């Protein structure tokens, strides 16, 4: 009897172990790639610490009514910024895209449909990036090639910060740099202007890439953020300038 009970317990333990392995394998298969799982994480998380600059990066798929107010507040300081625009948004807001470029703002690539790039194959990654670039350049067709190159640099901000090996391979193929962030204000979720400003400014330093979105509370927080940047002896500029500039450059 004892031997039979022992065999039964042993069999049950083996079955549980096998089921556990199957479940773990299934969960692993369903889990998207994260930075830790990416073999070669070539994303940029911060700019040049000697630049004297920080970059305010606005990811834009909605909030059109706040975009131009954000641009105005930054322009009033004589500063600059980068708007990472979604292709679908740009398609519906071509006039705003033209005005931003005309005012000297940088327009990065945020994909066309805000898809999870860790789950896309090479064709899907390529399509999202290329369609958005072609769309932006078509909207800005009145610009010279040199002006368009400056306005639409090969910078890609993956939606939701979702990274994958295939995405990096496609970025390299297309000549794009994947841009992440040093600090995330989480303004899309937390509608609290004081909290947004605190997250943007706490421990701020040259080279920081600060992620924001066009929301009502972000606009409310922006004057405090800009004041805090100035108080730290820094200026706000585009991602390109923050990555490459040195303190003695204009």
Please give the residue ranges for each predicted region.
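Structural recognition of the beta-strand scaffold that forms the well-ordered cores
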Residues: 55-57, 81-85, 106-109, 154-158, ...
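Active-site beta->alpha N-cap acidic-glycine motif
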Residues: 33-120, 124, 128-144, 148-153, ...
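His/Asp/Glu-enriched short active-site or ligand-binding loop at hydrolase and phosphoryl-transfer sites
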Residues: 162-163, 167-203, 234-245
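Hydrophobic membrane-insertion alpha-helices, especially the h-region
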Residues: 11-28
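N-terminal Lys/Arg-rich, disordered targeting/topogenic segments
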Residues: 1-10
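Non-membrane alpha-helical structural segments and their capping/turn regions in soluble enzymes
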Residues: 122-130, 194, 201, 219
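Basic- and aromatic-lined ligand-binding clefts that recognize polyanionic substrates
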Residues: 139-171, 217
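Binuclear metal-dependent phosphoesterase catalytic core
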Residues: 218-247
């Amino acid at each position: 009897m004892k031997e039979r009970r022992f065999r039964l317990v042993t069999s049950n333990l083996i079955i549980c172990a096998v089921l556990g392995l199957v479940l773990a394998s299934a969960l692993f298969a369903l889990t998207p790639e994260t930075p830790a799982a990416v073999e070669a994480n070539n994303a940029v998380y911060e700019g040049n610490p000697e630049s004297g600059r920080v970059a305010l990066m606005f990811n834009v798929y909605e909030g059109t009514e706040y975009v131009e107010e954000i641009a105005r507040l930054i322009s009033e300081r004589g500063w600059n910024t980068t708007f990472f625009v979604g292709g679908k948004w740009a398609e519906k807001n071509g006039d705003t895209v033209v005005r931003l470029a005309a005012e000297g703002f940088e327009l990065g690539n945020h994909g066309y449909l805000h898809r999870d790039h860790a789950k896309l194959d090479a064709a899907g990654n390529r399509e999202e990036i290329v369609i958005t670039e072609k769309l932006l350049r078509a909207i800005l067709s009145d610009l010279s090639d040199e002006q368009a190159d400056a306005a639409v640099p090969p910078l890609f901000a993956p939606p939701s910060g979702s990274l994958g090996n295939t995405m990096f391979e496609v970025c390299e193929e297309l000549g794009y740099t994947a841009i992440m962030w040093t600090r995330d204000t989480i303004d899309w979720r937390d509608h609290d202007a004081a909290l947004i400003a605190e997250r943007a400014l706490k421990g701020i330093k040259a080279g920081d890439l600060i992620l924001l979105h066009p929301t009502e509370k972000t606009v409310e927080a922006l004057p405090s953020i800009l004041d805090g940047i100035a108080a730290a002896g820094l200026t706000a500029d585009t991602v390109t300038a923050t990555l490459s500039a040195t303190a003695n450059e204009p």
